[in-house]
A protein has these predicted regions:
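Short, conserved beta-strand element in jelly-roll/cupin
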Residues: 35-50
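Short strand-coil-strand connectors
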Residues: 28, 52-56, 79
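Short secondary-structure boundary/capping segments
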Residues: 15-17, 33, 41, 57-58
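Short, surface-exposed charged micro-motifs
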Residues: 41, 65, 75
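Conserved short histidine dyad/triad with adjacent acidic residue
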Residues: 9-11, 18-37, 69-70
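Ligand-binding loop in jelly-roll beta-barrel domains
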Residues: 70-87
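Short acidic-glycine-tyrosine-enriched beta hairpin
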Residues: 55-70
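Cytosolic regulatory regions built on CNB/CRP/Popeye-like sensor folds
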Residues: 1-11, 15, 23, 62
Length: 87
């Protein structure tokens, strides 16, 4: 069985410039389950969310760059209205 986890770090200036050209996604506070059918990298613009997954949980905030691998099942809790770039 593959060990899937969410990776979170601060992006470089070059990454911010590149990612800021991508599409955005936003949500009001809510909870939902989500299965990643592709690898996704995202940069939080504003807001806050906790992502729970088998083996752990992470909370992402403005300025966080995070990666969710294909096949990961998450329970997302949007704590504050959130907006992110994603690709």
């Amino acid at each position: 069985m593959q060990n899937l986890e969410i990776l979170v770090r601060k992006p470089t200036e070059g990454e911010i410039e590149y990612i800021s050209k991508e599409i955005t996604w936003e949500s009001d506070p809510c909870e939902f389950d989500f299965d990643y059918d592709h690898n996704e990298t995202a940069l939080v613009i504003y807001g806050c969310a906790t992502l729970r997954y088998p083996g752990g949980e992470v909370t992402v905030r403005p300025g966080d760059l995070f990666f969710c691998p294909k096949g990961l099942h998450t329970h997302c809790i949007v704590l504050e209205k959130i907006k992110k770039y994603e690709f």
